[in-house]
Amino acid sequence: MGVWLNKDDFIRDLKRISLCLLILYVVVVVGTDQNFYSLLGVSKTASSREIRQAFKKLALKLHPDKNPNNPNAHGDFLKINRAYEVLKDEDLRKKYDKYGEKGLEDNQGGQYESWSYYRYDFGIYDDDPEIITLERREFDAAVNSGELWFVNFYSPGCSHCHDLAPTWREFAKEVDGLLRIGAVNCGDDRMLCRMKGVNSYPSLFIFRSGMAAVKYNGDRSKESLVAFAMQHVRSTVTELSTGNFVNAIETAFAAGVGWLITFCSKGEDCLTSQTRLRLSGMLDGLVNVGWVDCDAQDSLCKSLDTTASTTAYFPPGATLNDREKSSVLFLNSLDAKEIYMEIIHNLPDFELLSANQLEDRLAHHRWLVFFHFGKNENANDPELKKLKTLLKNEHIQVGRFDCSSAPGICSDLYVFQPCLAVFKGQGTKEYEIHHGKKILYDILAFAKESVNSHVTTLGPQNFPASDKEPWLVDFFAPWCPPCRALLPELRKASTLLYGQLKVGTLDCTIHEGLCNMYNIQAYPTTVVFNQSSIHEYEGHHSAEQILEFIEDLRNPSVVSLTPSTFNELVKQRKHDEVWMVDFYSPWCHPCQVLMPEWKRMARTLTGLINVGSVDCQQYHSFCTQENVQRYPEIRFYPQKSSKAYQYHSYNGWNRDAYSLRSWGLGFLPQASIDLTPQTFNEKVLQGKTHWVVDFYAPWCGPCQNFAPEFELLARMIKGKVRAGKVDCQAYPQTCQKAGIKAYPSVKLYQYERAKKSIWEEQINSRDAKTIAALIYGKLETLQSQVKRNKDEL
């Protein structure tokens, strides 16, 4: 028997059903949303090292090799592998934080290694506190901090690297405190390793600011490594005697430096010469190290009431011959590290600045200031006491300020928790807060960069909302790793942009209202304010690309096309003109990711290919008319033929500047000449023009990648140097005679030399601009020689 519902009951039940369906939909969506951070079990603030450690733990547990009976093992592992691939990469992590997985459509990944790789090869130094795994973004700052670094460049698959690992760990423990021990994974940071000239593994280099890197070529025993490291440690041990004792002590005390002295008597224990050298290196600039032979200097030791072997630290101003009144620290250990830690703990803390003197002191000098609230937390890391000495040559003083003594001052600076900041000699107006790691080398790098940069900490009182000058403002959150990675690059960019535009940072965890006003939804968000115009930066986190972005705002490389200008410039283009056009929509995440790459590509194609873009949100009906069915839609319009509307659509997977440029150049007529053995001999070797020749093989992948770059080069040097190509598969004897041992190989053949040789000069670059600059430099030198020879005749 049916049941009839009245209207009210029907509406009520319909609402219930709709609510249930909505809840079900939300559950399904949430259940399928794979948050990469939660997949790895890390927070959004996790460091690269924490992400590697979390992934390794999961990889060893979930790897398909260890779960052969689980049909879902492959799929489950792909998920965590994908999460790791994205979060380990700074740029992909930024895209993911901002757009979610939508922003990663061009970076699918999907490959993983065997279980044994993750067990034995992956992150081999991540669990060693004495060894710091350095990444590209922090490497230069670390090795230029002023500390001595010994760095192991290794590859995960290298057996010799694994053979060295146990020794490297023992060595790191042995020299801890004397120098920094680092490691670079060249499997993850290939570009960094290439930049540092690393072409074999393991490669061990010593680095110190102001000196060239020194490669270690000895045997890989711990003793040999220690001996090599000690050659580069600055250590001076003074033998004290009646003749020099008083002057040495008084001179050091006057400079605020104390003495560590070991008094040695025959048959009794005192610090060995090797231990004294190590302590001198560890305490370099902080404490002088000396020793007294009490058998030879009996009267001196007796005057100091020392009758047995003793080691003591004499702080500045210590009374040497009255132990009861003196602040002398007597040391019972013979171990260098134990003595070092005890002395460091007893060194005086940084100067405490008072509220009354703060503004005046900061106005007349550059300062690194530690802010604390009551208890001084810096005491937990006594190594930070080295800062005063290591920053002395930079003319940066180091002090501390207790915010509990003057809360108003800290509140005005937006300091609400313990932190440190650099003040640039203009009082409290110009300062920058440190958001990096609270470890010595990171703070050193920050202080040196900050005092020489032009980055301003912004707040409501100085935010450039209506400033007539252009500003680049970085909206960030201190907990966000990509934000922290961007800050050093902003400092570099600010020095290069000084006088052109100002650079500032705004902490959105403090100034939430300002960030909401500008609709900041992800961190970091970097924006250029130019009076009424606002432009958001979407590029990579590098000073170079920030500068490119600014230059593109001044001189746009991409033509913004309207339906009218599209018809005029593209459809009615001249016979020899070509265009590449990006049809996009501002709300489309892949379009937003593409835009900086599109602009970068356009700059490299200036004079060769016209580049434009069409906003399909603004000109929707026009894009529909042009049959644009997806975003972004990239089209190439070739040299005009009878088919004016002919175009080619880009279907490639990668939408980076290099891939897009190669695709576009592939449609241009060949500018280089295909050479045969006969034409190579007649035109290149016996001809009266300069030639640059690309020796290649059709099956060679790098040759195929280089081909469009060589075509670009041919166009750049047209009229001055001719460009040719030799197919080494078709003409092996020609290539063999030219001494070709690898593909591609590029050689320059210069006319007017004494005699052209088939070997000539090889060019090792694969960048068209670099090759062109090198060629022009060679030709200029050659012309000078020819002119000089003619003058002599």
Curated annotation (Swiss-Prot):
Start and end residues of each Thioredoxin domain: 130-232, 454-553, 557-665, 671-776
Subcellular location: Endoplasmic reticulum lumen
SS bonds (residue pairs): 158-161, 480-483, 588-591, 700-703
InterPro entries (UniProt xref): DnaJ_domain, ER_disulfide_reductase, ERdj5, ERdj5_TRX_C, ERdj5_TRX_N, J_dom_sf, Thioredoxin-like_sf, Thioredoxin_CS
Region entry Trxb 2, spans: 348-463
Assembly and oligomerization: Interacts with HSPA5 (via its J domain). Interacts with EDEM1.
SUPFAM superfamilies: Chaperone J-domain, Thioredoxin-like
Superkingdom to which the source organism belongs: Eukaryota
Gene Ontology MF terms: ATPase activator activity; ATPase binding; disulfide oxidoreductase activity; Hsp70 protein binding; misfolded protein binding; oxidoreductase activity, acting on a sulfur group of donors, disulfide as acceptor; protein-disulfide reductase activity; protein-folding chaperone binding
Positions of glycan attachment: 530
Chief place of localization: endoplasmic reticulum
Record-given protein name: DnaJ homolog subfamily C member 10
Short motif Prevents secretion from ER, span: 790-793
Tissue: Ubiquitous. Particularly abundant in secretory tissues. Ubiquitous in fetal tissues and tumor tissues. Higher expression in fetal tissues than in adult tissues. Expressed in testis, pancreas, fetal thymus and fetal kidney. High expression in heart, liver, kidney, and testis. Low expression in spleen and skeletal muscle.
Keywords in alphabetical order: Disulfide bond, Endoplasmic reticulum, Glycoprotein, Oxidoreductase, Redox-active center, Repeat, Signal
Biological source species: Mus musculus
Trxb 1, as annotated region: 235-350
Signal peptide: 1-32
Mutagenesis or variant effect for residue 161 to A: Abolishes disulfide reductase activity
Ranges where the J domain occurs: 35-100
Any GO CC annotation of this UniProt entry: endoplasmic reticulum chaperone complex
This protein's domain notes: Thioredoxin domains 3 and 4 are the primary reductase domains.
